[in-house]
Structures are given as structure tokens and as C-alpha cells.
């Protein structure tokens, strides 16, 4: 069944706004697991704007599920990933001026660098995914780079005006088929929330959705565990309905 990766970055964002010790991302990770999260996702950015090195090191040994560490392809970040050895690393693009990740990794234009990073992480026993736009050329390049997992950037779908998401959903569907054709595990994420997650979760073959901001926001009103449970329930229900409708 489809898996939910709960991204805890914005728990850390709330903490860093006042440079306090709360809310604690460690507790967020553990309580998300209790509520049904299948993995915990966190992005250690070069500017350390939310998740800190100490968070990564504290969370890693405590998880009962999996850690999915998002990071840029830099010597520093690859060193940290190889030292921490999470079960999964998702390589992402990064710009210091962006509010959040703005697009997918440019794999086709930096094939050698991506291939080297993937090989190094694989040698450390880490499964590697590449966060890419739902573009056939990028998926083919990801396969050439040796990646066994891709995460499709759902931002264009999530940001489409009401009633106009259909073409973006078709694009994601085609990208999913291409990834599966290459024998890859295909995940997805970015901008997904309670009102738009169902059509993505219904795509048979999507293994995992990584969602954070929407869950953190809903937790303000409903509490953390309920926000996680409700997102997971929406995903599972959408997938089950899609399978029954075949």
C-alpha cells in the first residue's frame, strides 16, 4: 500500500523563528511514527534555516521506520549523509534565496556529478532517490545516473488553478510510467495537501508521498497525530478506491 513520509522541516522552522528549543523535531518524528507515518523526511539545507545537524544525528537512531534525508549534492552534505547513514537520501536542488524547493534536480545537465554522488551513497549502503520534475528526459538521465528511486515534483500540479490540474496530472502519470519502465521505485511530493492529495495517491505505482507543510499547518487546529492520521487515511482511501475501480 502507498506510504506516507512525514516531512518535519516546518516543525523546525517554527522553532528557528524564535531560536528556542521547542517545538522539538525529534518528538515530532517519533509521534508521527506513532500516528502511522511510514518514514520521516527532513531536509538539511546548506543554510540550516530549519533542520540542524543536531536534529539529524538525534533522530536517526531513534526511528523505528526510515529516515529520508534530503540534501544538495555538495561535498559537505555527502559527507554528512555518509556519516549518518540514513536508510534513504533524496538528492535535491537548492537555492539560498528560495522559500522552498522550486524545481526538480537538473540531472541531464549534470550527469557526471549526479552519477558520482549516487555511487558514493550507494557504496555507503544508502538508497538514493532523485527529486526531479515529471520530465521524460530527466527520468532517463536519472536511470543513467544509477538511481533506483525517483521522487516526482508535484509542485506544478499543486499550484495549478482550480479545474486546470488535469494536464499536470497526465504529465505525472506519464512520468510514473516511464520510471516504472526503468524499474525504478517512484515517489512523489511537493505542495500536496488534504484537498489535492487524492488524485496523486490514486496513481497505482506511486510508492510514497512526502508531505510536510500541510500536515504541520493542519496540526495547529487538529493536533499533530490526528493531522498525520488523516493524511494517511486520505491516501490509503484514494488508492483503495482506484484499485477497486479497475
Curated annotation (Swiss-Prot):
It is an enzyme of class 2 (transferase). The record marks 151 as: Transition state stabilizer. Pfam families: PdxJ (PF03740). Homooctamer; tetramer of dimers. 1-deoxy-D-xylulose 5-phosphate binds at residues 9-10, 45, 50, 100. Its EC number is 2.6.99.2. The active site is at residues 43, 70, 190. Belongs to the PNP synthase family. GO terms for biological process: pyridoxine biosynthetic process. CDD domains: PNPsynthase. This is Pyridoxine 5'-phosphate synthase. Keywords: Cytoplasm, Pyridoxine biosynthesis, Transferase. 3-amino-2-oxopropyl phosphate binds at residues 7, 18, 191, 212-213. It catalyses: 3-amino-2-oxopropyl phosphate + 1-deoxy-D-xylulose 5-phosphate = pyridoxine 5'-phosphate + phosphate + 2 H2O + H(+). The keyword Membrane does not apply. One of its GO terms (molecular function) is pyridoxine 5'-phosphate synthase activity. One of its GO terms (cellular component) is cytosol. HAMAP family: PdxJ. It is found in: Cytoplasm. Pathway: Cofactor biosynthesis; pyridoxine 5'-phosphate biosynthesis; pyridoxine 5'-phosphate from D-erythrose 4-phosphate: step 5/5. The keyword Ubl conjugation does not apply. NCBIfam families: pdxJ, PRK05265.1-1, PRK05265.1-3, PRK05265.1-5.
Amino acid at each position: 500500500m502507498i506510504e506516507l513520509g512525514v516531512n518535519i522541516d516546518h516543525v523546525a522552522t517554527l522553532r528557528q523563528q524564535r531560536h528556542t528549543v521547542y517545538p522539538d523535531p525529534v518528538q515530532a518524528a517519533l509521534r508521527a511514527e506513532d500516528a502511522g507515518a511510514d518514514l520521516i523526511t527532513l531536509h538539511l539545507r546548506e543554510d540550516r534555516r530549519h533542520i540542524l545537524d543536531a536534529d539529524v544525528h538525534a533522530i536517526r537512531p531513534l526511528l523505528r521506520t526510515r529516515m529520508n534525508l534530503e540534501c544538495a549534492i555538495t561535498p559537505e552534505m555527502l559527507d554528512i549523509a555518509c556519516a549518518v547513514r540514513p536508510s534513504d537520501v533524496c538528492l535535491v536542488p537548492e537555492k539560498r534565496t528560495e522559500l522552498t524547493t522550486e524545481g526538480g534536480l537538473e540531472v541531464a545537465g549534470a550527469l557526471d556529478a549526479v552519477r558520482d554522488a549516487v555511487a558514493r551513497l550507494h557504496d555507503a549502503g544508502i538508497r538514493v532517490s532523485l527529486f526531479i520534475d515529471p520530465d521524460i528526459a530527466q527520468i532517463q538521465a536519472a536511470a543513467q545516473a544509477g538511481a533506483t528511486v525517483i521522487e516526482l515534483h508535484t509542485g506544478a500540479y499543486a499550484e495549478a488553478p482550480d479545474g486546470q490540474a488535469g494536464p499536470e496530472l497526465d504529465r505525472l502519470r506519464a512520468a510514473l510510467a516511464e520510471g516504472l519502465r526503468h524499474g525504478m521505485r517512484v515517489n512523489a511530493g511537493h505542495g500536496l495537501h488534504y484537498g489535492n492529495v487524492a488524485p496523486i495517491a490514486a496513481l497505482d505505482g506511486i510508492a510514497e508521498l512526502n508531505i510536510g507543510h500541510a500536515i504541520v499547518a493542519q496540526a495547529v487546529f487538529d493536533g499533530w497525530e490526528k493531522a498525520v492520521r488523516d493524511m494517511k487515511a486520505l491516501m490509503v482511501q484514494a488508492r483503495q478506491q482506484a484499485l477497486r475501480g479497475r
